[in-house]
A protein has these predicted regions:
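Active-site beta-loop-alpha junctions enriched in small/polar residues
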Residues: 156, 185-189, 236-240, 302-304, ...
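Extracytoplasmic/secreted cell-surface and envelope-processing proteins
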Residues: 189-192, 240-243, 307-309, 344-346, ...
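Short alpha-helical segments and helix-capping/turn motifs at coil-helix boundaries
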Residues: 49, 53-61, 165-168, 217-218, ...
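Feature activates predominantly on carbohydrate-active enzymes
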Residues: 88-278, 285-296
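Active-site neighborhood of glycoside hydrolase catalytic domains
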Residues: 261, 265-352, 356-368
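Acidic, contiguous N-terminal accessory segments
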Residues: 1-149, 289, 334-343, 347-349
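Flexible, acidic glycine-rich loops studded with aromatic residues
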Residues: 339, 346-351, 357-413
Length: 413
């Protein structure tokens, strides 16, 4: 290639480019035979993005070339013309993008789905710089290395308004992330309206104020789906359960600490012999399962303690029952932080293990389970990076480096 390879981010599987620059018409005609409302909205969005950098008013003097070839046609072909209501773990994002100046300047996109077509349009948008492309002959072939390309947003500790979440989703789409891990409950709050237990959010005041209505969640999921992004909810139990304290009481959720209450700070759920805690959590998670269409539900299960009546065995039983309920009663795949497998041993064979602290992905995939890598030393962007700018190399750690090829297939491809 004649110029820097960083034309598209993240860098695709294959990129070939050569030839002189190619100007792009301020009026792009994007056509497709795939009758998808989602793809139509993607075309509308990316047309607006490209127009912002193509419009003559936004170009520096001398960038336009009278009589030079102009790219004015973009043709999209979707090989599997089935419109999924929402993206899932089975969704395909592969695409091929070609740009040719001859015989007539045009871009051609072949994608496996409307999600792949949107990724190609994102790549095409990134190629347009000040009204032109860096080369007139470009071929991009791309598919994700990882099925789960996620970002976690902690709304259990801090509330983020819906418009802020939408801005985040736009940014995620720009770098081809496809999972918003919505950490919806923690010490401070349960951040989603429950119609079965309305006091969960009606009691949120002061610094703990702020929650999403169920209509907000539906709108968030729809906005994310349009950008090929799944919304995977996490309801962190039995530890990190201070946000569930409004459900405490003789007939509700029981807690390990004596005197647990709104001012206790940290709450851990007790798996009481009468099953009151489990019954309340099952009812709440069932409601949330109906609200979130994704096929994965994250149960947290991290950082529990042996405290008061809460023993390691009682914690194991509680986590195992909830993981089983997610799979059997709700028809979803359970997920938990690494403690669900390495500490409590409560992970079922189908449980996705989210490694983050003391363990690595190969320890999970060696057991035949799927792993999501979220190692705090590499990926916690709210923490200061050691060594200043030089410390960012940890962010580029290859999370699959020590995973045997035979274990990568079910876990990533």
């Amino acid at each position: 290639m004649a110029s820097s390879p960083w034309l598209i981010f993240p860098y695709p599987q294959s990129l070939e480019a050569h030839g002189p620059p190619l100007h792009v018409s301020p009026v792009l005609n994007i056509t497709t035979s795939h009758r998808s409302r989602r793809l139509a909205r993607s075309i509308e969005r990316y047309t607006a993005h490209m127009y912002a950098v193509i419009h003559p008013h936004n170009l520096n003097d001398g960038t336009l070339c009278a009589g030079c070839p102009e790219l004015s046609e973009v043709h999209i072909h979707v090989t599997r013309p089935i419109e999924e209501q929402h993206p899932s773990s089975l969704s395909c994002y592969n695409y091929t993008l070609t740009v040719r100046a001859r015989p007539t300047p045009a871009a051609h996109i072949q994608a496996c789905s409307d999600f792949g077509a949107a990724y190609a349009l994102e790549g095409l948008t990134q190629l347009v710089r000040t009204g032109r492309m860096p080369h007139d002959t470009i071929t991009v072939v791309d598919e994700p290395d990882y099925k789960w390309r996620g970002l976690m947003l902690d709304t259990g500790r801090r509330f983020f308004p819906l418009d802020t979440v939408k801005n985040l989703l736009d940014t995620m789409a720009g770098v081809k992330l496809n999972v918003l891990h919505l950490h919806a409950s923690d010490f401070c709050r349960f951040s989603i309206e429950s119609k079965r237990f309305p006091n969960l959010t009606s009691s949120l005041t002061g610094i703990k104020a702020g929650h999403y209505t169920q209509d907000d969640i539906t709108e968030m999921i729809s906005y994310a789906s349009d950008r090929g992004i799944r919304v995977v909810p996490e309801f962190d139990v039995p530890g990190h359960s201070g946000g569930l304290l409004p459900l405490s009481g003789p007939g509700g959720i029981q807690f390990c600490e004596t005197g647990s209450g709104p001012s206790s700070g940290r709450g851990q759920i007790f798996n009481d012999p009468a099953g009151k805690s489990y019954q309340a959590m099952h009812a709440l998670l069932e409601e949330m399962s109906d609200l979130f269409p994704d096929d994965v539900m994250h149960l947290g299960c991290d950082e529990t303690s042996v405290v008061g009546p809460c023993t390691l065995d009682s914690t194991f039983q509680f986590e195992r029952k909830l993981a089983t309920a997610v799979a059997v009663d709700f028809g979803k795949t359970p997920e938990g932080w690494e403690e669900i497998y390495f500490d409590a041993g409560a992970a079922t064979n189908d449980t996705i293990v989210n490694v983050w602290s003391r363990h690595e992905a190969p320890e999970v995939t060696a057991t035949g389970r799927r792993a999501v890598e979220s190692h705090s030393g590499n990926f916690y962007f709210t923490q200061a990076v050691p060594g200043g700018p030089d410390g960012w190399h940890m962010v580029y750690h290859d999370i699959g480096a020590n995973v045997p090829a035979a274990q990568k297939s079910p876990a990533w491809r």
